[in-house]
Amino acid sequence: LQEDEEVKARRPRWRRWWMGCLGVVGGLVALVLLAALAGVVLWHTGRVSLWFAEKQSAKTEGVAPADRPWPPLGTPAGEEPEDRWPGPSLDASRVGDRAAFFVRTNVWRVDLAFSEDEWRALQPTGHKPSVDFNAPDGKFPLRNDAAPRNGLAGVMGLGQPWSKGRVTVGGVAFDGVSVRLKGNGTFLNSFTALKKPFKVDLGRGHPGRALAGSAVLNLNNLVSDFSSMSDAMGYRMYREAGVPAPRTAYARVRLGLGERYRRRPLGLYVLVENLDEGWLAEWFRGRDAALFKPVTYELFKDLGTNWSAYEGIYDPKVRVSDAHKARLMEAARFVTGSTDAEFGARVAEFFDLEEVARFVAVTSAIASYDGFLFNGQNFMMYLDGPRGRFGLVPWDLDQAWGEFPLVGTVRERERASIERPWVADHRLLERLFGVESFRRVYRAEMERIVREWFVPARLRAEVRELAAWVRPTVLEESDYRRGRFEEAVKETWDADGPEPRIDDPFRPVHSMHRFIVRRHESLEAQLAGREKGVVFEKRMPFGK
């Protein structure tokens, strides 16, 4: 041992120094490799996605004051805030069908109750996120094969598992109900909040169980819509114009959670009718039809003759037959491979041109860009079986009426082009607008909509009406939400100022009255040839 020490002592000093440096570097490399390995494990298991979603949501939620203190269990009923709520007491047991349940001024009392274990089971799960999240052309990924759902949440590697709970709607109670979280942007923006978006499935595990003909209730939490009426007014516009679309109602939702809360108000939600077999049967009067929820920038791209290549992208919402599948694949071959002459001659065999033109006209009129015109999602597609023709259905309108901040500025969206209403490239619309007969039908539909439905006096009166119905429930929410609501629905608006950053939570509230007045002015001017309208040539890179 003493001999070894003497050998070490005789080594040159520089060599001892060099060996020490190698030891330090080796240790650092080992630490880096361990950190990288841990990062890979966390990435593949989805822990990074959960952490990121929590941080982003916390940033959003930090804008609003903390929830008001809520009386604990055992508080005398007379002291509970819900007893002083002046809203209506609607009885769901007296409602026989969807048309009576989904009335846009109905505000239903909805109670959701979970045990602590049920609430934990409801929370998001982590999966491997998509690698190519921010493409330079602005086309952020829409699908992630490693996640159980399509859309932004799935791309981030987030799942929405089903849990159980007790649900009461308008005094009608259901036990053992399947409930999960829902949505993409609204889900992420309320990730750490109690007021989450919910999907309630009364029939899951209980075949035939429904309320007013609906087995599924979509409770959208309005986190992105300070006016609380974008969905209600948007779907009504589509339906009145003759486009197949869901109906809406409102809900005042309360949460019961183990020993923590008995009936804690979460605030105002919009109830959107579920698009399913019942909705299809009513709209198509019982004839054969299929319903899809596509998630793709390349609608009707030819992917071959194997249905498995289409199924995940087109996400059927009802049971589809072999004939339905074959027709969709045939339409994809036609749209992808036909010449311009062939497309113009046969397009009416595959698409209901009046229905599609009507859908695009309404979508353009209300400047709804979080969907079909821009990002390849947030719409439905139906197939009329006997006719073999496809049409389009609106979905997710919480940022319609010029609100969606990822396309242009507020002023540009008010003046958006009706001749070229899509953003950047859109193969299907480019082909349709290249057909003179389609352009003629589209122009006639736009003129009819502006003449009969997009009428400022009528729409502004609707804003006032809905504001009066929902205000009592909004007043239960935070001071921040109440203030933003009043700004969104007030009759006057400030002069144009500098355009704020899209990620600024304090940016000016989108004014419904302003958009209605200014958009109508632009629509009339474009139809009269006095204005060309703003064309959005490029997509904004996501996250910029």
Label the model's feature ranges.
Residues 182, 256, 382-384:
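Short beta-strand micro-motifs enriched in acidic
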Residues 197-207, 211-216, 220-223, 227-228, ...:
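Internal "kinase-insert"/substrate-recognition segments embedded within catalytic cores
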Residues 12-33:
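N-terminal Sec-pathway targeting helices
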Residues 2-15:
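Juxtamembrane low-complexity tails/linkers enriched in Ser/Thr-Pro and polybasic
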Residues 184-186, 190, 284-298, 397, ...:
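Short, His- and charge-rich active-site/binding loops that engage polyanionic ligands
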